């Protein structure tokens, strides 16, 4: 899919859902990036486009959004990392994470968010350090949701990765003795239902 079609899709969905550019861009890119993308100009990289499309509740063919080799390498590393974590191979995951950190633009909130999420998961699952995991998950959430607050969660526009991160955060809170997953689970379900 070329940038003109991606931009048209984003604009169509954003207008249809009555979502402001400001709200869609919050925490992931500038408003001008969305305006340029909607106009069919090169404005956003793969990970930003993926998050924008996700926040609009759309699934996408990730390969079609990729615009360069580095995006593909980072995407492949994310897939390998996820696989190693699912297999509980935390040492291998840590090696892949170091490789990811070396390749990724850590100025990008989306890459930093992913790194902190993985570090949080390893802290939680391998080291059973729920306090460090809580810190990592919270820092990751606030990278794309700078005014993150569970009490105001309904006001935020969340993409798939942010929902996964939020569930990890709340699940870890359970391990710290805070019963928040049940309290905020209905809001998460509403997001999932809206995205279907």
Feature roles, as predicted:
Residues 66, 101-111, 126, 142-158, ...:
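Flexible helix-coil transition and linker loops at the boundaries of alpha-helical arrays
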Residues 1-16:
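A short, Lys/Arg-rich alpha-helix, primarily the initiator
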Residues 47-63:
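DNA major-groove recognition helix of helix-turn-helix/homeodomain DNA-binding modules
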Residues 65-91:
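Short, charged recognition helix plus adjacent turn
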Residues 12, 22-23, 51:
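Alpha-helical residues within helix-turn-helix
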Residues 9, 75, 79-82, 111-122, ...:
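"A position-specific structural signal for the A-helix of alpha-solenoid helical repeats
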Residues 85-99, 126-147, 174-193:
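Helix-turn-helix repeat elements of alpha-solenoid scaffolds
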Residues 16-36:
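Short alpha-helical DNA-recognition segment
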């Amino acid at each position: 899919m070329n940038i003109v079609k991606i931009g048209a899709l984003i604009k169509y969905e954003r207008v249809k859902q009555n979502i402001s550019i400001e709200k869609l861009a919050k925490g992931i890119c500038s408003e001008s990036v969305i305006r340029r993308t909607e106009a069919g100009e090169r404005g956003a990289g793969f990970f930003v486009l993926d998050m924008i499309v996700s926040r609009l509740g759309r699934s996408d063919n990730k390969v079609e959004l990729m615009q360069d080799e580095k995006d593909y390498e980072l995407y492949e590393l994310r897939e390998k990392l996820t696989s190693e974590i699912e297999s509980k191979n935390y040492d291998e995951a840590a090696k892949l994470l170091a490789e990811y950190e070396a390749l990724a633009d850590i100025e990008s909130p989306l890459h930093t968010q992913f790194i902190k999420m993985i570090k949080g998961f390893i802290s939680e699952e391998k080291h059973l350090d729920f306090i460090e995991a809580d810190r990592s998950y919270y820092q990751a959430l606030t990278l794309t949701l700078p005014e993150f607050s569970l009490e105001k969660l309904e006001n935020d526009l969340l993409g798939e990765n942010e929902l996964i991160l939020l569930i990890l955060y709340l699940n870890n809170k359970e391990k710290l003795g805070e019963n928040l997953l049940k309290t905020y689970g209905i809001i998460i379900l509403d997001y999932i239902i809206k995205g279907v």
